[in-house]
Amino acid sequence: MWQLLLPLALGLGTMGLGRAELTTAQHRGLQVALEEFHKHPPVLWAFQVTSVDNAADTLFPAGQFVRLEFKLQQTSCRKKDWRKEDCKVKPNGRKRKCLACIKLDSKDQVLGRMVHCPIQTQVQRELDDAQDAQCSRVERAGEDPHSYYLPGQFAFIKALSP
């Protein structure tokens, strides 16, 4: 029996996080990301989340920052119907690998967002650096820029004092 369960457990472990394993903030971030994705004019078909590969949230004074990496696949529904439960994933439909960075305040209002979902074959290394920079800007949304200090930030001021 164990010989049958071990491959199943290993297979499920490599599939990424399930939607049930996401925190409340991560669920809200995923919802905001899907809404944002389906707003874009080039998107004609509804897409469905096939896996969540990475999910992290960080609490800041201005709110909660959520970073999600997930995969989408095209369904048989038009984009206006993306919320419908009966939309089936097309076996040969387009696939997208997404990075979403969402900043939520204490009332679940969106302070900042960045959603990037290129077609999976178009993912390039240069874009990853630009996405990380955009994600960092979203992470700092609503924060006081003077609430934290970097090492050595005041070293020159003290050195110039008599």
Curated annotation (Swiss-Prot):
InterPro entries: Chemerin, Cystatin_sf. GO terms for cellular component: extracellular matrix; extracellular region; extracellular space. Keywords: Chemotaxis, Differentiation, Disulfide bond, Inflammatory response, Secreted, Signal. Residues 156-162 form a propeptide. GO terms for molecular function: signaling receptor binding. PANTHER family: RETINOIC ACID RECEPTOR RESPONDER PROTEIN 2 (PTHR15106:SF2). This is Retinoic acid receptor responder protein 2. The gene is RARRES2.
